[in-house]
Amino acid sequence: MKYIIIVAALFLVSCSNGSEYQVVSKVPDLTMPTNGLKFEEIENYQNFKVVATHFRTDKNELRYVMVNEVAFNAFSDNELLPEGSKIVKIGWKVKEMSNFSVALEADKIQRVEYMIKDATRFKDNPGNWGYARFVKEANKYKSWDKGTASCIGCHNLARDNGFVFSKKQILF
């Protein structure tokens, strides 16, 4: 009976308005070889807010774009992203839905990429952005070993938007 009361109390506390659902994750211990960014800098990124989705036709990849609170506030106010902003992109391989063949759905994660705005560490990068990419192969992540020059080159196309392609997608 004592265990039932304890379980019931824990259930009630977890369902109260005072608690928030939080995902706690342990990311791999990986570091980008060219700039020292670590996967752990986005520990618990699953709690970031989704602001956009994209489909990369060249990679046949669906991307969820998630941001930390600092970036979310700027996205919400339609402002350039400030120091401390973090943007995470999750790239999913897509597959045809088994029960609705005219639709595609996310299948397997192919990559986790992120950008962090840090004027101290990335003062020589356009917009003070640092870039990291962790590719998933055979169910294991590895650091991207081809550098970040391609990230910087591509994001230069979005110079007028603070080197960020995404804009917050309105849900209504």
Outline where the language-model segments fall.
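C-terminal motif of bacterial Sec signal peptides marking the signal peptidase cleavage site
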Residues: 12-14
